[in-house]
Regions:
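N-terminal hydrophobic/helix-forming segments and targeting peptides
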Residues: 1-453
């Protein structure tokens, strides 16, 4: 399993956006014989295809020998993570105080503690699409030769008023702007005769640099998707190196293990399916999220290429309604430093295997998909047979908070769904903690589940 863990650490280090996750998941799938469904006219048992949605989410299918109307075994994870997104007009210079500092103006994405994102090195990833359709990929901050970016904070010596505010307010979302550059007053201290920078020159110089290096202009940011993420690679924690520290482990720890379980699995009686979805952190809305027709459209494309008897629309509906799904998403690990937030009898712990969440939601299970015990028993039986370690848990104590996954969107099709993922400490922080043992068990769990009859 060492290769699995090392490959996982590399994957989350190199794929910090949903676009990169999709691009490299497709590459991995192709290495295992998966083809773009748009390149295939007919499908039969044993065929392996993927459905790419706008380069930001994807679904893989391994066609089984049974009629697809009998249902599929589905693994469903998400590949987006909390971050800071650049605004549409993102670059500005401090002209009021004439400091020469140039900033990237951002809007946070997903549920974050804003104070965790200041005074730390950040990288910029994304794509800029020019008016002629040319795409320019941006990746700055993780190469050793790259600069990084940073959001400044107030020194504690003068932060008395700031520190009186609640944690949700003492760093304002509107002030989560990263320093891009700082131009001094004098252009050349060794030769003052070269003149001084005037207000606005700093922004002009940044834009000039971007045009020379990337061929993009300020207007091109209107059609850009740029993300500020933590700079640096994932690392092992502790003397025993049993824990992994990395950005975006919610939910790429489940996405990667689901992907590898899927591509390594052989075709069985039931068709296997693996969803790597976007937009979960903001409610799964949008064309690349699960709160769209992402899944049923993909299944319809598969059914259209199969020799299905009868009404194809009914075949799609039956295929979905008769499916089994693991919503592969993470759960909050018990934190002994904050034990009062957890029901210790119903918590998940690092290093004890994958986690079953029968339900998620908030308060009175609002927004939950409550799994059926008959289905849970079926999954349990398979995991016992495959010697997979698992535990049962909730997110926290009742009324302490809550959360959701993509489970209820899949359940709308009438299928059986169970949340099953990896425990995470410091969830939604720039750097999250998982257990290498749990990652191994997730892989084993997902591989076993795909064999469910």
């Amino acid at each position: 399993m060492d290769n699995l863990i090392n490959n996982y650490v590399s994957f989350i280090s190199e794929n910090k956006t949903e676009r990169l996750c999709t691009k490299n998941s497709i590459r991995i799938a192709q290495e295992y014989g998966y083809r773009d469904i748009n390149s295939v006219d007919k499908l039969k048992a044993g065929d392996k295809v993927y459905y790419d949605k706008m380069g930001k989410s994807m679904i893989l299918f391994n066609i089984g020998s049974d009629d697809i109307s009998k249902g599929m075994n589905i693994l469903g994870a998400h590949i987006d993570s909390p971050r800071l997104d650049a605004k549409q007009n993102p670059i500005y210079e401090d002209k009021l105080y004439k400091t020469g500092i140039v900033y990237l103006n951002t809007h946070y994405y997903g549920g974050i503690k804003k104070y965790q994102w200041v005074a730390s090195p950040l990288a910029i990833y994304g794509v800029v699409v020019k008016a002629d359709g040319t795409k320019v990929d941006i990746a700055i901050g993780d190469d050793p030769e790259d600069p990084v970016f940073c959001i400044s904070d107030i020194l504690p010596h003068i932060a008395q008023e700031q520190m009186k505010k609640p944690a949700s307010d003492f760093i304002e979302g509107e002030k989560l702007d990263a320093v891009l550059a700082c131009y001094p007053n004098v252009k050349n201290y060794k030769n003052p005769e070269e003149g001084k920078y005037e207000p606005g020159d700093g922004k002009k110089n940044v834009l000039k640099y971007l045009e020379e290096k990337y061929g993009i202009t300020e207007d091109d940011f209107a059609s850009a998707e740029l993300e500020l993420v933590p700079a640096g690679k994932a690392r092992f924690i502790g003397f025993d190196k049993t824990l992994v520290l990395g950005y975006g482990q919610d939910d790429r720890v489940c996405a990667y293990t689901s992907l590898i379980a899927m591509v390594e699995g052989a075709a069985g009686a039931r068709t296997n399916c693996c969803i790597l979805a976007d937009k979960e952190e903001i409610g799964s809305n949008g064309a690349t999220g699960m709160n769209s027709h992402l899944l049923d459209n993909a299944v319809a494309e598969v059914v259209a290429r199969l020799d299905v008897k009868g009404n194809p629309e009914l075949a799609v509906r039956r295929a979905l309604a008769n499916s089994y799904m693991l919503s592969s998403d993470v759960n909050s690990a018990f934190d002994p430093l904050n034990a009062g937030l957890y029901d210790i009898y119903n918590s998940s712990f690092l290093g004890r295997g994958v986690v079953f969440n029968k339900y998620t939601g908030a308060r009175g299970k609002s927004g939950a998909s409550d799994a059926n015990p008959e289905f849970i028993a079926k999954v349990r039986g398979k995991l016992y047979e495959s010697e997979v370690y698992f535990q049962n848990a909730e997110l926290s104590k009742v009324d302490t908070g809550g959360g959701g996954t993509i489970a209820h969107y899949a359940a709308e099709f009438g299928m059986n769904v169970l949340d099953c993922g990896v425990s995470v400490l410091s969830m939604h922080a720039p750097w999250e903690i998982t257990s290498a043992f749990d990652i191994e068990q997730a892989y084993k769990c997902y591989k076993a589940f795909l064999l469910l009859a």
